[in-house]
């Protein structure tokens, strides 16, 4: 049975970011894959819900004026790494006209597609968070700390949600920028936990 008191929030664990040779490879990202797998395994086991963001770009997206082309729809690089995927996955496009089924939360993993850095630009993100309720705690991990991780965590905090960053399951492009982002999140109320602590939190809440 899923624990709805805690939700894991995985940020952009995609081939182009996570794997050497990816179009926008984050140096060192492959080192956090084992911890991502450990966290996602809990969703595979039906222990809790996993929400993921995923870049799904078109070839001419405006973001490519700032960053090299990456995660283009239909290319291998847009795929979430196998270690970041559960078995029952439901993808939600960045399209406000798309209707979500009542059974959306019956899945192990919900993937929110985006074409910008901020997952809350997908209009369905707000609705998913609202439907999960204000008492849900979010454990955030993935890449990149100073961009998409920061915006996802801050977006949740701004909406009154409790957020913890899984500190050994994140990676940054530039260390100084990543540290600045984490300091800001800490000042806003984010906590920091290890993968071991995150897994123990789920087990502890489930036992209550």
Descriptions of predicted regions:
Residues 2-8:
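Extreme N-terminal starter segment of soluble prokaryotic enzymes
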Residues 139-142, 161-175:
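A short glycine-rich beta-strand->turn/loop micro-motif centered on a GG-aromatic cluster
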Residues 112, 190-201:
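Short acidic-hydrophobic, aromatic-tinged amphipathic segments that line or gate anion-handling sites
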Residues 34-137:
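Active-site alpha/beta core segments
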Residues 5, 49, 137, 161-164:
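Residues at the starts of beta-strands that form the adenosine-phosphate
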Residues 36-42, 147-158:
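Histidine-anchored nucleotide/phosphate-binding helix
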Residues 123-134, 196-208:
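Short amphipathic alpha-helix with an adjacent loop that forms part of the alpha/beta core around
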Residues 21-29, 66-71:
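Short glycine-enriched, charge-decorated loop/helix-capping segments at active-site entrances
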């Amino acid at each position: 049975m899923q624990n709805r008191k805690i939700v894991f929030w995985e940020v952009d664990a995609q081939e182009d970011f996570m794997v050497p040779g990816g179009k926008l490879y984050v140096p060192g990202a492959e080192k956090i894959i084992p911890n991502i797998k450990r966290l996602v395994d809990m969703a595979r086991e039906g222990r809790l819900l996993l929400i993921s963001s995923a870049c799904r770009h078109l070839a001419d997206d405006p973001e490519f004026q700032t960053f090299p082309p990456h995660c283009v729809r239909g290319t291998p690089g847009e795929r979430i790494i196998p270690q970041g995927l559960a078995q029952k996955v439901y993808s939600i496009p960045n399209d406000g006209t798309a209707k979500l089924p009542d059974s959306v939360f019956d899945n192990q993993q919900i993937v929110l597609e985006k074409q910008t850095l901020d997952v809350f630009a997908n209009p369905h993100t707000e609705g998913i968070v609202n439907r999960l309720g204000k008492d849900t705690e979010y454990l955030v991990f993935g890449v990149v700390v100073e961009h998409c991780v920061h915006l996802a965590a801050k977006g949740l905090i701004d909406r009154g949600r409790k957020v913890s960053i899984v500190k050994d399951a994140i990676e940054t492009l530039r260390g100084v920028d990543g540290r600045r982002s984490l300091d800001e999140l800490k000042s806003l109320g984010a906590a920091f936990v290890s993968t071991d602590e995150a897994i123990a939190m789920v087990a502890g809440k489930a036992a209550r």
